[in-house]
């Protein structure tokens, strides 16, 4: 038996981390071989050349985009293809410390007593998942941090420019994601590390910032939820994204 990860073609680094990690955990539970393509941002190489033919396989996508029946997959007498997004925090919480080692996370804290805010813009405007200026302004005001640093995929966006020029925020790095790439460039990795190692962070509804929150050692994590927005619903259904966690009692749900 074996577990094979089949990355979704539309998935970027964060989404691929979910698929890879789900496959990694499942292969450990099944005590079987694990095959996957590369995650070069974490120096994980592909080993797909040895995968061979599939045997009585089942696809995780058969359960849905996010939901999967772990017990059934573990007991399945055959191969498992991980081809869904599997974005449920409960799949990963028990393995957090092991995953920190897997992804080579350091025991580092920076930006103490500051809030680092992630703003995902670009494609989120198109898919109606962008939280918007009013949301971020209220979050910043309610959080009461004297200094706010913005990590974003588009420093030219009206929202980001307004937060910098009118509300006193500063930028961690400058730039715009113009083209889709499945792996992150050096600027994006710098932003990821800033989020992961900062003392206090407010994430966006993105897998990129979720992994930074989950793997880091934070004093405060603010999770964003917006009433009426289907992306990351505040009350998720069976096959919705459900990534809220509060492992160390440091996490806050921020809903407007």
Residues of each region from the PLM?
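Secretory-pathway luminal glycosyltransferase catalytic domains
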Residues: 3, 39-146, 155-158, 248-250, ...
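Nucleotide-sugar donor-binding patch of glycosyltransferase catalytic domains
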Residues: 210-256
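A short beta-strand-loop structural module common to alpha/beta enzyme folds
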Residues: 30-42
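Donor-binding and catalytic core of enzymes assembling or modifying cell-surface/extracellular glycoconjugates
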Residues: 13, 146-222, 231-233
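A short, glycine/small-residue-rich beta-strand->loop->alpha-helix junction that serves as a flexible
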Residues: 8-18, 124-130
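Short hydrophobic segments within beta-strands
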Residues: 8, 118-120, 151, 224
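Histidine-anchored nucleotide/phosphate-binding helix
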Residues: 18-28, 136-141
């Amino acid at each position: 038996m074996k577990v094979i990860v089949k990355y979704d073609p539309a998935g970027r680094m964060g989404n691929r981390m979910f698929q890879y990690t789900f496959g990694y955990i499942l292969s450990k539970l099944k005590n079987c071989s694990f095959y996957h393509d590369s995650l070069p941002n974490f120096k994980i190489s592909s080993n797909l050349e040895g995968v061979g033919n599939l045997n009585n396989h089942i696809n995780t996508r058969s359960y849905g985009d996010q939901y999967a029946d772990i017990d059934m997959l573990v007991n399945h007498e055959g191969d498992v293809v991980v081809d869904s997004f599997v974005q449920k925090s409960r799949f990963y919480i028990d393995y957090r410390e092991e995953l920190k080692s897997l992804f080579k996370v350091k025991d580092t804290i920076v930006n103490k007593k500051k809030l680092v805010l992630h703003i995902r813009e670009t494609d989120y405007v198109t898919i109606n998942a962008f939280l918007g200026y009013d949301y971020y302004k209220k979050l910043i005001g309610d959080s009461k941090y004297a200094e706010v640093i913005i990590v974003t995929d588009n420093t030219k966006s009206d929202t980001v420019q307004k937060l910098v020029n009118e509300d006193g925020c500063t930028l961690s790095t400058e730039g715009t994601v113009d083209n889709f790439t499945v792996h992150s460039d050096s600027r994006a990795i710098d932003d990821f590390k800033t989020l992961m190692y900062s003392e206090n962070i407010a994430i966006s509804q993105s897998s990129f910032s979720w992994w930074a929150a989950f793997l880091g050692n934070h004093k405060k994590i603010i999770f964003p939820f917006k009433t009426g927005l289907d992306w990351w619903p505040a009350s998720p259904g069976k096959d919705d994204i459900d990534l809220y966690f509060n492992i160390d009692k440091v996490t806050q749900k921020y809903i407007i």
